[in-house]
Amino acid sequence: MPLSAPAPRKLEHLRDIQLRGYVREDGLVDIEAHLTDTKTYGFPSEHRGQVGPGDPIHGMWVRMTINEDMLIIACEAASDHTPFAVCTGATPAFAKLAGLTIGPGFNRAVNERVGGVLGCTHLREVLAQMGTVAFQTMWPLRNRRQAAQRKAEAAGAPRKRPALLGTCHAYAPDSPVVRKKWPEWSDLAEKREEAQI
């Protein structure tokens, strides 16, 4: 259902963030973000001269290369448009994200490496969203891995706990989604086992 009709208004500022997930030929995954900020009016800038209506105030990129375990193999950032020339000096710091794993504690670890004066607020803000896109991109790859695991199970290998179990309301151990998708991992399965003991 869409939002209700707004009151009469005029657009002043637009932040556009595009997030994309790519599966590479080498099996790794690139998560890429492009952020732009524009105004609907022109204004003078001490460092850039006149910034026209629709001209980017910020035009920034981040690319993270990750493996199937959500480990960041490489990260790079670039700033095409910034309010100050010195802003581009923050982009090399984002290479320090290599070696982090996207998961619990990711945002804290990001802030330790590129927080405050070590990085750029705008580039840092998109990293949490990039983590979400990484999970959305990786899901089909994990599905294929789980399908292979199910084949191995049929041969007698034990099944691993699903990575998404317990990560949100839909994947709560007592949810209908878990009961259908992973019945052996639902709370009902645990209760059945306890009743048999």
Stretch-by-stretch model annotation:
Residues 13, 21, 35-197:
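Active-site- and interface-proximal helix/loop "cap" or "latch" segments in soluble metabolic
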Residues 1-43:
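Short, Gly/Pro- and small/polar-rich lid/capping loops
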